[in-house]
From Swiss-Prot:
Classification via Pfam families: HSP33 (PF01430)
Organism per entry: Neisseria meningitidis serogroup B (strain ATCC BAA-335 / MC58)
Keyword Cytoplasm set for record: yes
GO biological process terms held by the UniProt record: protein refolding
Listed name of the protein: 33 kDa chaperonin
Subcellular localization(s) per the UniProt record: Cytoplasm
HAMAP family hit by this protein: HslO
Family: Belongs to the HSP33 family.
Record has Iron as a keyword: no
Disulfide bonds: 234-236, 267-270
Source organism, top-level taxon: Bacteria
Gene Ontology cellular component list: cytoplasm
PTM field: Under oxidizing conditions two disulfide bonds are formed involving the reactive cysteines. Under reducing conditions zinc is bound to the reactive cysteines and the protein is inactive.
Gene name for this UniProt entry: hslO
Role description: Redox regulated molecular chaperone. Protects both thermally unfolding and oxidatively damaged proteins from irreversible aggregation. Plays an important role in the bacterial defense system toward oxidative stress.
Length: 302
Protein backbone atom coordinates (compact mmCIF):
# COMPACT_ATOMS: atom_id res chain seq x y z
CA UNK A 1 0.00 0.00 0.00
CA UNK A 2 1.33 3.41 -0.95
CA UNK A 3 0.94 5.71 2.03
CA UNK A 4 2.04 9.32 1.76
CA UNK A 5 2.50 12.12 4.27
CA UNK A 6 3.35 15.45 2.65
CA UNK A 7 4.94 18.35 4.46
CA UNK A 8 6.40 21.49 2.92
CA UNK A 9 8.87 21.68 5.80
CA UNK A 10 10.43 18.32 4.88
CA UNK A 11 13.13 19.64 2.60
CA UNK A 12 16.68 19.13 1.42
CA UNK A 13 18.61 22.24 0.45
CA UNK A 14 21.75 22.23 -1.69
CA UNK A 15 24.39 24.95 -1.46
CA UNK A 16 27.81 25.68 -2.93
CA UNK A 17 30.58 28.15 -2.17
CA UNK A 18 31.52 30.18 -5.24
CA UNK A 19 34.90 31.18 -3.84
CA UNK A 20 36.03 27.66 -2.91
CA UNK A 21 35.39 24.12 -4.24
CA UNK A 22 33.05 23.04 -1.45
CA UNK A 23 29.45 21.87 -1.77
CA UNK A 24 26.89 21.07 0.85
CA UNK A 25 23.45 19.77 1.68
CA UNK A 26 21.09 20.53 4.54
CA UNK A 27 18.04 18.43 5.37
CA UNK A 28 15.27 18.81 7.90
CA UNK A 29 12.43 16.28 8.11
CA UNK A 30 9.51 17.07 10.38
CA UNK A 31 6.14 15.49 9.53
CA UNK A 32 7.83 12.72 7.57
CA UNK A 33 9.88 11.83 10.65
CA UNK A 34 6.90 12.01 13.00
CA UNK A 35 4.95 9.75 10.63
CA UNK A 36 7.75 7.16 10.79
CA UNK A 37 8.15 7.13 14.57
CA UNK A 38 4.41 6.65 15.06
CA UNK A 39 4.63 3.26 13.32
CA UNK A 40 6.36 1.58 16.29
CA UNK A 41 7.09 2.22 19.96
CA UNK A 42 10.80 2.90 19.46
CA UNK A 43 13.07 3.18 22.52
CA UNK A 44 14.60 6.66 22.68
CA UNK A 45 18.14 5.53 21.80
CA UNK A 46 16.94 3.58 18.75
CA UNK A 47 14.60 6.37 17.69
CA UNK A 48 17.49 8.82 17.78
CA UNK A 49 19.77 6.54 15.74
CA UNK A 50 17.03 5.84 13.18
CA UNK A 51 16.36 9.56 12.72
CA UNK A 52 20.04 10.22 12.16
CA UNK A 53 20.25 7.40 9.60
CA UNK A 54 17.15 8.72 7.82
CA UNK A 55 18.67 12.20 7.57
CA UNK A 56 21.92 10.65 6.35
CA UNK A 57 20.10 8.70 3.64
CA UNK A 58 18.42 11.85 2.35
CA UNK A 59 21.76 13.68 2.34
CA UNK A 60 23.58 10.91 0.47
CA UNK A 61 20.76 10.44 -2.04
CA UNK A 62 21.49 13.97 -3.21
CA UNK A 63 24.36 12.46 -5.20
CA UNK A 64 22.16 9.97 -7.10
CA UNK A 65 22.90 10.46 -10.80
CA UNK A 66 20.11 8.22 -12.13
CA UNK A 67 16.59 7.23 -11.11
CA UNK A 68 16.57 4.73 -8.29
CA UNK A 69 16.77 4.28 -4.53
CA UNK A 70 19.59 4.62 -2.04
CA UNK A 71 19.31 2.27 0.94
CA UNK A 72 21.46 2.73 4.05
CA UNK A 73 21.50 0.02 6.70
CA UNK A 74 23.23 -0.59 10.00
CA UNK A 75 23.22 -4.24 11.04
CA UNK A 76 24.30 -5.77 14.34
CA UNK A 77 24.11 -8.84 16.56
CA UNK A 78 23.23 -7.12 19.81
CA UNK A 79 19.90 -5.85 21.08
CA UNK A 80 19.61 -3.70 17.95
CA UNK A 81 19.44 -5.94 14.89
CA UNK A 82 18.96 -3.45 12.08
CA UNK A 83 18.31 0.15 11.14
CA UNK A 84 17.31 0.85 7.54
CA UNK A 85 16.42 4.03 5.69
CA UNK A 86 15.53 4.40 2.02
CA UNK A 87 15.57 7.59 -0.06
CA UNK A 88 14.47 7.50 -3.69
CA UNK A 89 15.21 9.79 -6.61
CA UNK A 90 11.52 10.82 -6.64
CA UNK A 91 12.16 12.26 -3.16
CA UNK A 92 10.20 9.71 -1.17
CA UNK A 93 11.55 8.09 1.98
CA UNK A 94 10.79 5.34 4.47
CA UNK A 95 12.65 3.89 7.46
CA UNK A 96 12.33 1.27 10.18
CA UNK A 97 14.28 -0.63 12.84
CA UNK A 98 14.33 -4.13 14.28
CA UNK A 99 15.45 -4.82 17.83
CA UNK A 100 14.99 -7.20 20.74
CA UNK A 101 11.79 -5.80 22.20
CA UNK A 102 12.25 -7.82 25.40
CA UNK A 103 15.59 -6.15 26.20
CA UNK A 104 16.09 -3.10 28.40
CA UNK A 105 17.47 -0.12 26.47
CA UNK A 106 18.53 3.03 28.30
CA UNK A 107 17.77 6.40 26.72
CA UNK A 108 21.45 7.35 26.47
CA UNK A 109 22.87 4.09 25.12
CA UNK A 110 25.36 4.39 22.29
CA UNK A 111 24.89 2.85 18.87
CA UNK A 112 27.93 0.63 19.37
CA UNK A 113 26.57 -0.79 22.62
CA UNK A 114 23.20 -1.51 21.01
CA UNK A 115 24.67 -3.24 17.95
CA UNK A 116 27.24 -5.34 19.80
CA UNK A 117 30.25 -6.88 18.08
CA UNK A 118 30.38 -7.49 14.36
CA UNK A 119 28.25 -4.54 13.30
CA UNK A 120 28.37 -3.49 9.65
CA UNK A 121 27.28 -0.54 7.54
CA UNK A 122 25.60 -1.43 4.24
CA UNK A 123 24.97 1.03 1.42
CA UNK A 124 22.92 -0.16 -1.56
CA UNK A 125 22.24 1.70 -4.80
CA UNK A 126 19.18 0.23 -6.47
CA UNK A 127 18.78 1.83 -9.92
CA UNK A 128 15.42 1.83 -11.65
CA UNK A 129 17.15 0.16 -14.60
CA UNK A 130 20.24 -1.96 -14.22
CA UNK A 131 21.93 -4.02 -11.56
CA UNK A 132 22.09 -2.90 -7.91
CA UNK A 133 25.42 -2.06 -6.29
CA UNK A 134 26.22 -2.71 -2.65
CA UNK A 135 29.06 -1.78 -0.34
CA UNK A 136 29.56 -3.39 3.08
CA UNK A 137 32.10 -2.15 5.61
CA UNK A 138 32.70 -2.76 9.33
CA UNK A 139 31.34 -0.07 11.62
CA UNK A 140 33.95 2.54 12.41
CA UNK A 141 33.39 5.63 14.52
CA UNK A 142 31.32 6.47 17.55
CA UNK A 143 28.08 7.23 15.73
CA UNK A 144 26.35 7.29 12.38
CA UNK A 145 27.84 10.63 11.29
CA UNK A 146 31.45 9.58 11.92
CA UNK A 147 30.75 6.16 10.41
CA UNK A 148 29.59 7.82 7.18
CA UNK A 149 32.53 10.21 7.10
CA UNK A 150 34.91 7.26 7.37
CA UNK A 151 33.00 5.36 4.68
CA UNK A 152 33.05 8.27 2.22
CA UNK A 153 36.71 8.97 2.88
CA UNK A 154 37.47 5.34 2.06
CA UNK A 155 35.15 4.93 -0.93
CA UNK A 156 35.22 8.36 -2.59
CA UNK A 157 38.50 9.76 -1.23
CA UNK A 158 36.71 13.04 -0.55
CA UNK A 159 37.01 15.10 2.60
CA UNK A 160 33.52 15.25 4.08
CA UNK A 161 32.00 16.53 7.30
CA UNK A 162 28.55 15.36 8.41
CA UNK A 163 26.42 16.47 11.34
CA UNK A 164 23.23 14.54 12.21
CA UNK A 165 20.51 15.01 14.78
CA UNK A 166 17.11 13.58 15.69
CA UNK A 167 14.58 14.68 18.29
CA UNK A 168 10.95 13.75 18.83
CA UNK A 169 9.96 16.59 16.50
CA UNK A 170 12.43 16.41 13.62
CA UNK A 171 15.45 14.71 12.05
CA UNK A 172 18.16 16.85 10.50
CA UNK A 173 21.49 16.67 8.79
CA UNK A 174 24.25 18.82 7.33
CA UNK A 175 26.92 17.68 4.87
CA UNK A 176 29.85 19.72 3.56
CA UNK A 177 32.26 18.15 1.10
CA UNK A 178 35.19 19.03 -1.12
CA UNK A 179 34.32 18.96 -4.81
CA UNK A 180 36.05 16.06 -6.59
CA UNK A 181 39.14 16.78 -8.68
CA UNK A 182 39.38 20.32 -7.33
CA UNK A 183 42.28 21.81 -5.40
CA UNK A 184 41.31 23.35 -2.08
CA UNK A 185 43.61 25.09 0.31
CA UNK A 186 43.82 23.05 3.52
CA UNK A 187 43.28 26.14 5.62
CA UNK A 188 40.06 26.98 3.73
CA UNK A 189 38.70 23.45 4.19
CA UNK A 190 39.61 23.47 7.85
CA UNK A 191 37.78 26.77 8.24
CA UNK A 192 34.58 25.42 6.66
CA UNK A 193 34.64 22.11 8.52
CA UNK A 194 35.42 23.83 11.82
CA UNK A 195 32.41 26.11 11.41
CA UNK A 196 30.24 23.07 10.62
CA UNK A 197 31.42 21.40 13.84
CA UNK A 198 30.02 24.27 15.90
CA UNK A 199 26.47 23.34 14.89
CA UNK A 200 24.65 21.78 17.83
CA UNK A 201 22.17 18.92 17.65
CA UNK A 202 19.43 21.22 18.94
CA UNK A 203 20.11 23.80 16.22
CA UNK A 204 20.18 21.17 13.50
CA UNK A 205 16.87 19.62 14.52
CA UNK A 206 15.21 22.94 15.24
CA UNK A 207 16.35 25.36 12.51
CA UNK A 208 15.63 25.46 8.80
CA UNK A 209 18.36 25.71 6.16
CA UNK A 210 18.25 29.50 5.92
CA UNK A 211 18.94 29.96 9.62
CA UNK A 212 21.54 27.17 9.82
CA UNK A 213 23.55 28.49 6.86
CA UNK A 214 23.42 32.06 8.13
CA UNK A 215 24.43 30.92 11.60
CA UNK A 216 27.48 29.08 10.20
CA UNK A 217 28.59 30.94 7.09
CA UNK A 218 27.30 34.52 7.26
CA UNK A 219 30.82 35.88 6.64
CA UNK A 220 31.22 33.86 3.41
CA UNK A 221 27.64 33.02 2.44
CA UNK A 222 27.17 30.14 -0.01
CA UNK A 223 24.90 30.13 -3.05
CA UNK A 224 21.69 28.33 -2.06
CA UNK A 225 19.53 26.37 -4.49
CA UNK A 226 15.78 25.80 -4.51
CA UNK A 227 14.71 23.44 -1.69
CA UNK A 228 13.57 19.93 -2.61
CA UNK A 229 10.52 18.61 -0.78
CA UNK A 230 10.40 15.03 0.54
CA UNK A 231 7.49 12.83 1.58
CA UNK A 232 6.92 9.46 3.18
CA UNK A 233 5.88 6.70 0.80
CA UNK A 234 5.95 2.94 1.26
CA UNK A 235 6.57 0.71 -1.75
CA UNK A 236 5.04 -2.43 -0.26
CA UNK A 237 2.20 -4.08 -2.19
CA UNK A 238 0.17 -7.27 -2.32
CA UNK A 239 1.96 -8.12 -5.56
CA UNK A 240 5.38 -7.99 -3.87
CA UNK A 241 4.15 -10.20 -1.04
CA UNK A 242 2.79 -12.63 -3.64
CA UNK A 243 6.22 -12.77 -5.29
CA UNK A 244 7.78 -13.53 -1.90
CA UNK A 245 5.34 -16.39 -1.29
CA UNK A 246 6.06 -17.82 -4.73
CA UNK A 247 9.77 -17.83 -3.88
CA UNK A 248 9.03 -19.78 -0.68
CA UNK A 249 7.26 -22.47 -2.71
CA UNK A 250 3.87 -24.14 -2.60
CA UNK A 251 4.85 -26.85 -0.14
CA UNK A 252 5.95 -24.43 2.56
CA UNK A 253 3.17 -21.91 1.97
CA UNK A 254 0.48 -24.59 1.86
CA UNK A 255 1.78 -26.05 5.11
CA UNK A 256 1.55 -22.70 6.87
CA UNK A 257 -2.06 -22.23 5.74
CA UNK A 258 -2.93 -25.72 7.03
CA UNK A 259 -1.39 -24.90 10.43
CA UNK A 260 -2.59 -21.30 10.80
CA UNK A 261 -5.62 -20.99 8.52
CA UNK A 262 -4.06 -18.15 6.53
CA UNK A 263 -0.81 -16.25 6.02
CA UNK A 264 -0.52 -12.72 7.37
CA UNK A 265 2.35 -10.44 6.38
CA UNK A 266 2.84 -7.05 8.06
CA UNK A 267 4.95 -4.36 6.41
CA UNK A 268 7.75 -3.22 8.74
CA UNK A 269 7.68 0.29 7.27
CA UNK A 270 3.98 1.25 7.19
CA UNK A 271 2.23 -1.62 9.02
CA UNK A 272 -0.02 -2.49 6.09
CA UNK A 273 -1.32 -6.04 6.55
CA UNK A 274 -1.64 -8.55 3.72
CA UNK A 275 -3.73 -11.69 4.35
CA UNK A 276 -3.74 -14.77 2.09
CA UNK A 277 -6.30 -17.49 2.83
CA UNK A 278 -6.61 -20.94 1.26
CA UNK A 279 -8.37 -19.63 -1.84
CA UNK A 280 -5.77 -16.87 -2.33
CA UNK A 281 -2.83 -19.23 -1.97
CA UNK A 282 -4.22 -21.88 -4.29
CA UNK A 283 -5.01 -19.24 -6.92
CA UNK A 284 -1.50 -17.81 -6.56
CA UNK A 285 0.19 -21.14 -7.25
CA UNK A 286 -2.41 -22.35 -9.75
CA UNK A 287 -2.91 -25.63 -7.88
CA UNK A 288 -4.35 -26.89 -4.61
CA UNK A 289 -1.15 -26.49 -2.57
CA UNK A 290 -3.15 -26.43 0.66
CA UNK A 291 -4.85 -29.70 -0.24
CA UNK A 292 -1.48 -31.25 -1.06
CA UNK A 293 -0.23 -30.15 2.37
CA UNK A 294 -3.24 -31.99 3.85
CA UNK A 295 -2.26 -35.13 1.94
CA UNK A 296 -4.84 -34.85 -0.85
CA UNK A 297 -4.01 -35.60 -4.52
CA UNK A 298 -2.42 -32.74 -6.44
CA UNK A 299 -4.68 -30.89 -8.90
CA UNK A 300 -4.79 -27.52 -10.59
CA UNK A 301 -7.25 -24.75 -9.77
CA UNK A 302 -8.73 -22.06 -11.95
Amino acid sequence: MNQTAINRADVRTRFIFDDMPVRGLHVRLENVWQHIVKQKNYPAAIRRALGELLAAGVLLSGNLKNEGTLIVQVQGRGRLKMLVAEAASDRTVRATARWDETAEIADDESLGDLLGEGGVFVLTLQPKDGEPWQGVVPLEGGGIAQMLVNYMKRSEQLDTHIVLSASDEAAGGLLVQRLPEEVLDEEAWEHVSTLARTLTAEELAGLDAQHVLYRLFHETPPRVFEPETFEFSCTCSRGKVSDMLLMLGGEEVGGVVVEQGSIEVDCDFCHSKYVFDETDVNALFGEDVVGVAKGLPRHTVQ
